[in-house]
Curated annotation (Swiss-Prot):
GO molecular function, one term: ATP hydrolysis activity
Phylogenetic classification of the source organism: Bacteria, Bacillati, Bacillota, Bacilli, Lactobacillales
Keyword Repeat among record annotations: no
SMART domains: DNA_mis_repair, MutL_C
CDD domains: HATPase_MutL-MLH-PMS-like, MutL_Trans
Name this protein carries in UniProt: DNA mismatch repair protein MutL
PROSITE patterns to which the protein is assigned, alphabetical: DNA_MISMATCH_REPAIR_1
Family, similarity comment: Belongs to the DNA mismatch repair MutL/HexB family.
Length: 660
């Protein structure tokens, strides 16, 4: 008696669904790709409960005939290839005939479809892969597919679904990638009756970028174009000043298909060279047209991983295209645009002003217990920040106020203002080897900081500075050289650590609320994790599509830090996911202390330098910055005498050493 049997078709489809359909986003991907292959110009995706309850895809494509409709649920039944040779010149997104049978086997499926030639349309209803209804019906040309109760008969898969917000974020990401791959198609995504994404379908990729990432982001994207005998490369990449904390904003398309490829990602970064900060990544949409013979898409069940012939040549083409496009741009960030980040789009941009090329002079304000610069004139009652950049911000805001006064009769004062992301190019790379998102390094750093013990700091007498970076002081134990950035970073770290640790319900109302823009998937993920932000006193409310509004801020955060601080905290939250409040606050203290400390090449006057040393002496651990770097080094009197050979460890003569 034989023990090998042929599995029933429904069971085989359920097994195949385990590879093809991982989550609701997989269903959306497969069905939308079918709609694209059907030459649709409008595709609407509607979901309920993140797709677990209902997914409906409506298109205006070619549709299916009454005879073809039941065949579409047969495994490996397809209209896209007919012979073995077709497998090597695939230009459609689907070709295996697995998607619809797999979806039908684990859900209740309803298909309404009609072709332009048919007198009437057709409706098909299937449950668990079995057709229950097939009849004629009146319906517009195109196809409407409704998937209900996904995974109802595979409880193990349903059990391991993530939260509804997480699954919704995956759906949004899929629709966004497909929208970028096909800007000629008008996409609409509706979740529980609320529209999340909409693109115009004009064929303009930059317009699609604006619909997904926001207008401000699209304005800072530059187009790339290059070609050789085998490849055509086009698309858009962000200026080096516009970056993100992970690679999720890089989209690679081959013949209209979104793929994942580590080497091509590497080629994009290589195109930027040293223009990107460590741990930062660009926003990029790279559209590659390739002869189908050079690409094998029949590798992975989801077809997101493909094999490419001449991959090294393609990498070089992408890198060259990006580097040449960047070379043509003026990569010096607009000073007033960076400094006047709080100005709204309703105001005209002021003319560029030239800044004097002279060393920055930092001074100490004993009343505010902080440093400031005299490069610009600051009113006595203007808020003081932690470094010279913030002070210049204060001046720019005063200029903006003057502008409002002049145009008051023409336009009312804004009720909200768009926040700008911090420019990573403003950083001086004090810690290029440390990525705060490296969890292993971060965990070790936090453990060390948590176990610090109170230290005794020597009494120092400051007497000079070198290269605007190192302070010189003498004490009972000899000469001390202090790294001024590391010193104030330690001071600021302990300040922020204590302040953030005191987070309570004390909030300060903003006169003009801030708006913070995010991509669709990040917006949804942040909504799910909003309670973590609330723990540190950040309360963001949804305000339109992909936008949050901030109406008040915690008292420990100065108003001049709101834009950069909130964006940085959100980026950190998106990356760390399950971070504890304790760890989150420690990460925040480290991050803010580094960004708000004195940088290299800033000259300190004598009074300011002495005040910094006094603040350092009051720290719990004044000897290391939060990253573990030494704050100061010591040359004892004996060390100095040895270096100048005033004393020797032994009295062996040169003659005895054989020198003479």
């Amino acid at each position: 008696m034989t023990t090998i049997i042929e599995l029933p078709e429904v069971l085989a489809n359920q097994i195949a669904a385990g590879e093809v359909i991982e989550r609701p986003a997989s269903v959306v991907k497969e069905l939308v790709e079918n709609a694209i292959d059907a030459k649709s110009s409008q595709i609407t995706v509607e979901i309920e409960e993140s797709g677990l309850k209902m997914i409906q895809i409506t298109d205006n494509g070619e549709g299916m005939s009454h005879e073809d409709l039941p065949l579409s649920l047969r495994r490996h039944a397809t209209s896209k290839i007919k012979s073995q040779s077709d497998l090597f010149r695939i230009r459609t997104l689907g070709f295996r005939g697995e998607a619809l049978p797999s979806v039908a086997s684990i859900s209740k499926l309803t298909i309404k479809t009609a072709t332009a030639e048919a007198e009437h349309g057709s409706i098909l209803v299937a449950s668990g892969g079995k057709i229950e209804q097939l009849e004629a019906v009146s319906t517009p040309v195109g196809t409407k597919i409704k998937v209900e109760n996904l995974f109802y008969n595979t409880p193990a898969r349903l059990k391991y679904m993530k939260s509804l917000q997480a699954e919704l974020a995956h759906v949004v990401d899929v629709v966004n990638r497909l929208s970028l791959a096909h800007p000629e198609i008008a996409f609409t995504l509706i979740s529980d009756g609320k529209q999340l994404t909409q693109t115009s379908g004009t064929g303009d990729l930059r317009q699609a970028l604006a619909g997904i990432y926001g207008l401000n982001t699209a304005k800072k994207m530059i187009d790339i174009s290059s070609a050789d005998l085998d490849f055509e490369v086009g698309g858009f990449v962000s200026l080096p000043e516009l970056t993100r904390a992970n690679r999720n904003y890089i989209t690679i398309l081959i013949n209209g298909r979104y793929i994942k490829n580590f080497l091509l990602n590497r080629a994009i970064l290589d195109g930027y060279g040293s223009k990107l900060m460590v741990g930062r990544f660009p926003i990029a949409v790279i559209d590659i047209q390739i002869d189908p013979y050079l690409a094998d898409v029949n590798v992975h069940p989801t077809k997101q991983e493909i094999r490419i012939s001449k991959e090294r040549e393609l990498m070089a083409l992408i890198s060259t295209a990006i580097s040449e496009s960047l070379r043509e741009q003026d990569l010096i960030p607009d000073a007033l645009e960076n400094l006047a980040r709080s100005s709204t789009r309703s105001f005209s941009k002021p003319e560029q002003t030239s800044l004097p090329l002279q060393p920055s002079q930092l001074y100490y304000d004993p009343q505010k217990n902080d440093f400031f610069t005299k490069e610009t004139v600051v009113s006595e009652d203007s808020p003081q920040g932690f470094n010279h950049e913030v002070l210049i911000d204060s001046d720019v805001k005063q200029v903006d106020n003057l502008q409002v006064t002049k145009t008051e009769s023409e336009a009312a004062a804004p009720s909200v203002k768009y926040a700008s992301r911090p420019d990573p190019m403003l950083s001086d790379g004090e810690h290029p080897g440390l990525d705060v998102h490296n969890k292993q390094k971060l965990s070790q750093m936090l453990d060390r900081l948590e176990n610090e013990e109170q230290s005794v700091f020597p009494e120092l007498d400051y007497f000079g500075q070198m290269h605007g970076t190192y302070l010189f002081a003498q004490g009972r134990d000899g000469l001390f050289i202090i790294d001024q950035h590391a010193a104030q970073e330690r001071v600021k770290y302990e300040y922020y650590r204590d302040k953030i640790g005191e987070v309570d319900n004390s909030l300060q109302q903003l006169l003009v609320p801030y708006l913070f823009e995010f991509s669709g998937s990040d917006f949804i993920n942040l909504q799910e994790k909003m309670s973590l932000l609330n723990e540190v006193g950040i309360y963001l409310e949804p305000y339109g599509n992909h936008t949050f509004i901030l109406r008040e801020h915690p008292i420990w955060m100065k108003e001049t830090e709101i834009e950069s601080g909130v964006y940085e905290m959100c980026d950190m939250l998106l990356l760390t996911n399950e971070v504890s409040i304790k760890t989150y606050r420690a990460e925040l203290a480290i991050m803010m202390s580094c960004k708000h400390s004195i940088k290299a090449n800033h000259s300190l006057d004598d009074y300011s330098a002495r005040q910094l040393l006094l603040q350092l002496a009051q720290c719990k651990n004044p000897y290391n910055c939060p990253h573990g770097r030494p704050v100061l080094i010591n040359f004892s009197k004996a060390d100095m005498e040895k270096m100048f050979r005033r004393i020797q460890e032994n009295h062996t003569s040169l003659r005895e050493l054989g020198k003479y």
